[in-house]
Every structure is written in structure tokens, then in C-alpha cells.
């Protein structure tokens, strides 16, 4: 992961706000929570986490310092769960102090994702 200010020098972490400002257009990211949520945390690992096991409720080896990337598989399974279950899963992720959530493939996040992440802001 590199900072927008020093593209040739690797950094150990990057603020979510800086990540969004630096790479949002290039990655075609769209903010679905309020701007205040960008100030909430820092991305501390260079890799992303596909939270496939977390969406089932298994958090034993959850990589909470990484961007949480929900792809088509995670979102399909997640949407099959009840709204209450989805809320619990996202609340558990937030309690583990994740830096941010990215939903790929132009998929929409669930209302529970948006609500819980906004409240954690």
C-alpha cells in the first residue's frame, strides 16, 4: 500500500479518508455512508480480507486490520440471512475495529451494513 504523497515509498498504514481520496476514483468507489465515517479508522494491513467465514458467524481467525471486501459470493450468502443475523454479523465486525467495508461488482450493501457502519462512524 502506498500513500498518495509518496507513491514510491511503501507505508505501513493509511487512513481510510486518505485511501478513499487517493484511490476512490481509480477503483470506482462510491461512499454510501456519511463523510464522517472516513475519519473513523486506519487500514493497517496491505491485503484485503474476503469475509466469507465471518458472514457465517465464524470469527476465530478474522483479519480485522484489513479492508473487508464483500464480493458476489459473500453478498449472495449474506442476503440469504435474516436482517437480524446480518446486523449481528456487521456489529461483530465493527466491534473488532475493522477499517472499512468495500462491496464489489457494483452490488449494493444491505441496509443493515449501512446502518451499523454509519452508527459506528
Show the residue positions of the predicted features.
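Long, charge-dense
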Residues: 120-121
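Short, glycine/polar-rich helix-capping loops at beta-to-alpha or helix-loop-helix junctions
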Residues: 108-115
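Short acidic/polar active-site loop segments enriched in Thr and Asp
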Residues: 99
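Gly/Thr-rich phosphate-binding loop signature of adenosyl cofactor/nucleotide-binding cores
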Residues: 2-94
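Residue-level recognition of alpha-helix initiation/capping sites
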Residues: 84, 106-108
Amino acid at each position: 500500500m502506498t500513500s498518495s504523497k509518496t507513491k514510491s515509498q511503501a507505508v505501513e498504514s493509511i487512513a481510510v479518508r486518505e485511501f478513499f481520496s487517493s484511490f476512490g476514483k481509480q477503483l470506482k468507489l462510491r461512499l454510501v455512508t456519511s463523510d464522517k465515517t472516513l475519519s473513523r479508522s486506519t487500514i493497517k494491513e496491505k491485503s484485503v480480507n474476503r469475509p466469507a467465514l465471518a458472514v457465517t458467524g465464524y470469527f476465530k481467525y478474522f483479519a480485522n486490520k484489513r479492508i473487508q471486501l464483500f464480493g458476489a459470493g459473500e453478498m449472495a450468502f449474506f442476503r440469504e440471512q435474516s436482517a437480524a443475523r446480518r446486523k449481528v454479523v456487521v456489529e461483530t465486525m465493527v466491534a473488532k475495529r475493522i477499517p472499512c467495508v468495500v462491496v464489489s461488482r457494483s452490488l449494493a450493501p444491505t441496509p443493515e451494513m449501512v446502518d451499523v457502519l454509519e452508527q459506528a462512524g
